[in-house]
Amino acid sequence: MVKAKIAVNGYGTIGKRVADAVQAQDDMEIIGVSKTKPNYEAAVAHQKGYDLFAPASNSGAFEKAGIPLAGTIEEMVEKADLVVDCTPGGIGEANKPMYEKAGVKAIWQGGEDHELAGFSFNAASNYEGALGRDLVRVVSCNTTGLCRVIYPIDRELGVKKVRVTLARRATDPNDIKKGPINAIVPDPIKLPSHHGPDIKSVLPHINITTAALKIPTTLMHLHTVNMEVNTDCTAEDINRIFSSQSRIRFMSQGINSTAEIIELARDMGRPRNDMWENCIWPESITVHEREFYFFQAIHQESIVVPETVDAIRAMMELESDGAKSIQKTNKAIGL
Amino acid sequence: MVKAKIAVNGYGTIGKRVADAVQAQDDMEIIGVSKTKPNYEAAVAHQKGYDLFAPASNSGAFEKAGIPLAGTIEEMVEKADLVVDCTPGGIGEANKPMYEKAGVKAIWQGGEDHELAGFSFNAASNYEGALGRDLVRVVSCNTTGLCRVIYPIDRELGVKKVRVTLARRATDPNDIKKGPINAIVPDPIKLPSHHGPDIKSVLPHINITTAALKIPTTLMHLHTVNMEVNTDCTAEDINRIFSSQSRIRFMSQGINSTAEIIELARDMGRPRNDMWENCIWPESITVHEREFYFFQAIHQESIVVPETVDAIRAMMELESDGAKSIQKTNKAIGL
């Protein structure tokens, strides 16, 4: 079988994880990754055997740093069937003409607007809608984490209303510039946060309100989720529905915080201590009549990675069944 | 007028603030404060002119440290009309026999159970119920902050349901032992947190569910509050109701986090940068039909201080009208 040729434009927090996850599949391969500067991430990409591409204007800096380049970003794009754009939020939009000119398919991350791609993706919620598409946006970590729980509950019980408070990690572990380091920041102060509307880009009929806080931690986000449903249910019903989802993982055995979740991922030998699943505490599932609550933690660096692999598979029509793609992706990365 | 004689048993985070706030009133005075160890707080209490009392068994340590004592804790209690017990949560209960033996009135903090005093106090919600009582519990910072907003909304619009997510500061600024320093801790994992039931100790008929997270910050708690009410209303209505409360302060003018609230308190010359008021962002007040949301920040070290002064005034029957006591307390401390 000829593998689908995938390029990753922007080998940063998400891009490097997407590259490794794609490379682990048997129906797609990485033909190149791009980096603007010859930093430690570029050096490791080269050591791992990825062909490295950079803007033509920066080739001198790579040469000086002793990191060999395989060509320019335009040349990388020309070689690919599909480009996963993992450049910082807002930058990806400017790359659209380049992808169109080269006639390649493109995936953007949740930092870009829905309108740029015209289709926002979550594997469990709308895989089939992405089949054969040229342009897809994989929604952000928090939106992915919420779609993964809202979709199966809506299918089985009918969702009347969702209310979420998101405690967001201030920044990623490798960032030494952003804060806060000792404050709570309602972000935004004016409700709702963008997450509620963003869920609607995948699940348009869901009535949802979200409020977000930025807090001094780097490891994971944490959601307090409240859902009203249209059907009588028990905590056991919710538990059963979540248990049926391969990308939901229950937390117990002394895991009482995001710190212990990450320690679990480290102990499991997960690459970069990634936790691709929603981490839900089953003990927190509490039902009052047709309304329930629970806590879930979301690993911002990695949760969209398996979704991106599934998006590639749908767009390249390598698999028409979403459930089969999810299973295949999971197995290949060790989820 | 003879001033009511008040002792503070436990001159720590809350106790030292209560002592200063009582001393600022014209109808009550501090006749002594107690400390178990001769640390820097004891030294400052002495420098400020408070008579200092300690357990008889620790008098040698105070002598050695050069901090003069006025007597034992039992002797302090004997001199008082009313003791404010600010010992750590759970310790206060053991002091009840001592207060009963001395025939003094007693106030406990929210760390003790409701049953210990049989009456849980919030000035705006139930001042009159404390008139002449011998034993009162002033509810905790988070419960106080919630009573202050729930009571006036319930009176004007009727509260159908309250849902709160509390992002709790991990510990106070002077604590060097507790964490987390980089994690989010659902605390407790099993819902509801104790805050919901605790609100009912003041406002028994309120339907409320609370979920709490412990996060790496020391400055303030932050609540995401959702309320369903029985009456049609607008954001302006909510704004007007909150504006009528002297212990609610609106945040604007570039105050976007708890860090900036504390900076405001420092700039205002507040003692120990205390922010006695609920800090609400009016921009966050969002109404959907008969349901609204808002953010409020709560200064855990100081919010119960004016409430404690009002509780004293009610129990000593120095003022029969709660609104007048609140006004008098506020004016004396500069709120």
From Swiss-Prot, chains A, B:
SUPFAM superfamilies reported for this sequence: Glyceraldehyde-3-phosphate dehydrogenase-like, C-terminal domain, NAD(P)-binding Rossmann-fold domains
Enzyme Commission numbers on file:
1.2.1.59
Residue positions annotated to bind D-glyceraldehyde 3-phosphate are 140-142, 171, 195-196
What the entry lists under Pfam families is as follows: DapB_N, Gp_dh_C
Annotated Gene Ontology cellular component terms: cytoplasm
Q: Which UniProt keywords apply?
A: Cytoplasm, Glycolysis, NAD, NADP, Oxidoreductase
Residues that hold NAD(+) according to the record: 13-14, 111, 169, 300
Q: Where in the cell is it found?
A: Cytoplasm
- The record's active-site residues are 141
Give the main EC class.
oxidoreductase
Instruction: Say which domain of life the source belongs to.
Output: Archaea
Q: Does the keyword Oxidoreductase apply?
A: yes
Query: InterPro entries, from UniProt?
Result: DapB_N, GlycerAld/Erythrose_P_DH, GlycerAld_3-P_DH_AS, GlycerAld_3-P_DH_cat, GlycerAld_3-P_DH_NAD(P)-bd, Glyceraldehyde-3-P_DH_2_arc, NAD(P)-bd_dom_sf
Record carries keyword Metal-binding: no
Gene Ontology annotations of biological process type: glycolytic process; lysine biosynthetic process via diaminopimelate
What pathway or pathways are given for this protein in its record?
Answer: Carbohydrate degradation; glycolysis; pyruvate from D-glyceraldehyde 3-phosphate: step 1/5
- Which reaction does this chain catalyze? D-glyceraldehyde 3-phosphate + phosphate + NADP(+) = (2R)-3-phospho-glyceroyl phosphate + NADPH + H(+); D-glyceraldehyde 3-phosphate + phosphate + NAD(+) = (2R)-3-phospho-glyceroyl phosphate + NADH + H(+)
The Gene Ontology terms for molecular function here are:
4-hydroxy-tetrahydrodipicolinate reductase; glyceraldehyde-3-phosphate dehydrogenase (NAD+) (phosphorylating) activity; glyceraldehyde-3-phosphate dehydrogenase (NADP+) (phosphorylating) activity; NAD binding; NADP binding
Listed under subunit, the entry gives: Homotetramer.
* Family, per entry: Belongs to the glyceraldehyde-3-phosphate dehydrogenase family.
What name does UniProt use for this protein?
Glyceraldehyde-3-phosphate dehydrogenase
